[in-house]
């Protein structure tokens, strides 16, 4: 209370242009008057929050969905799973048979996840394709191969305690908000360096004395090579060459520069998280009362929002994609067969350690 009468100056990390971009996207894309959206823009490496909206109209609802609405995150959980896979010997060309599958679990129950529209390849698919089309069978096979506890433990590292280690966790049955989701993704986007997201840079009194100054943690929480290899894999979402039995999830959107992206959907929510070394954006759309999404237009709000932010960043900044470390080897592969193809798609493979 001693500071209350000192005329405090609060310096935030927010960028008015990014804030405006999020507000415009919310206004332009949410056609249904009752559908809600929340979005956040973050600067990788520093973890500064550059923009944040908790709903589409603050005058009608002050509830901050970005930080307080805990919803199932769907397939946006999968990059965390595939980070663990890369840590445990998987590569972009690791394959699993893709067909309708009933899994027998350790407690003698069964689990039968399905793909979108019940579409399957009915053959082996590789990790890159599984990411591009957001394949559920590949995700659950990976999850059970690694052990259900591994993914739960990784999520808990980010301070999310209420995580149930079960088979469906691989498909995003975790309830959290997009602030926490962005916090996890930003660690991958920052080459494994963890800094908690923040909005206040410093606070001074009317004499200019600093009362509070943000301090970075700069903790190397995740493996740098695995994060870089994963970021390269997440570019597959935009690549129409993967659109076979299912569409690559972001193939409808053409961007000038290279970006990583993962989408997610449940019956009641649609999400997208995208990033490059300059910016990360996460967006959610849905109804507050958990009604099913009605129109295909509303289901694309999150995708369009992240694309708007990526395009704005590309127009106003010199965006350069990540570079592989000396431990990673760039290899071009045919997207479907996984064979070497000099005209194929380049992914980063971990070199075998001698």
Model-assigned labels for residue ranges:
Residues 1-13, 20, 24, 156-157, ...:
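Non-catalytic, structured segments within soluble enzyme domains
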Residues 43-50, 158:
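Short, glycine-anchored, charge-dense loop/turn motifs used at functional sites
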Residues 7-13, 63-71, 113-118, 126, ...:
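Second-shell loop/turn segments in exported
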Residues 22, 47, 70-98, 130, ...:
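Active-site SXXK
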């Amino acid at each position: 209370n001693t500071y209350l009468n000192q005329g405090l100056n609060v310096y935030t990390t927010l960028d008015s242009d990014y804030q405006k971009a999020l507000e415009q996207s919310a206004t332009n894309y949410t056609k249904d008057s009752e559908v809600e959206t929340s979005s956040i823009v973050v600067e990788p490496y520093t973890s500064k929050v550059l923009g944040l909206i908790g709903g589409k109209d603050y005058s009608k609802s002050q509830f901050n969905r970005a930080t307080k609405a805990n919803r199932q995150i769907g397939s946006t959980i999968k990059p965390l799973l595939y980070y663990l896979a890369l840590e445990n010997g998987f590569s972009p060309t690791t394959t699993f048979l893709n067909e309708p599958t009933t899994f027998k679990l350790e407690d003698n129950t069964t689990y039968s996840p399905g793909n979108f529209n019940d579409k399957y390849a009915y053959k082996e698919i590789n990790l890159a394709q599984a990411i591009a089309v957001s394949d559920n069978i590949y995700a659950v096979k990976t999850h059970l191969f690694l052990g259900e506890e591994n993914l739960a433990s990784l999520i808990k590292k980010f301070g999310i305690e209420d995580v149930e280690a079960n088979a469906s966790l691989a498909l995003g049955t975790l309830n959290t908000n997009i602030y926490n989701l962005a916090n996890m993704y930003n660690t991958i986007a920052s080459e494994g360096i963890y800094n908690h997201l923040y909005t206040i840079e410093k606070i001074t009194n009317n004499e200019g004395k600093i009362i509070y100054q943000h301090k970075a943690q700069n903790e190397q929480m995740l493996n740098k090579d695995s994060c870089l290899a994963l970021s390269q894999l997440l570019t597959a979402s935009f690549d129409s060459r993967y659109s076979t039995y299912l569409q690559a999830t972001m193939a409808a959107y053409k961007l000038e520069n290279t970006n990583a992206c993962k989408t997610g959907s449940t019956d009641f929510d649609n999400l997208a998280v995208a990033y490059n070394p300059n910016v990360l954006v996460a967006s959610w759309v849905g109804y507050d009362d958990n009604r099913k999404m009605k129109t295909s237009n509303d289901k694309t709000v999150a995708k369009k929002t992240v694309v708007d932010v990526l395009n704005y960043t590309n127009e106003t900044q010199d965006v350069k994609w990540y570079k592989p470390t000396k431990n990673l080897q760039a290899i071009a592969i045919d997207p479907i067969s996984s064979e070497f193809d000099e005209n194929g798609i380049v992914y980063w493979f971990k070199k075998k350690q001698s």
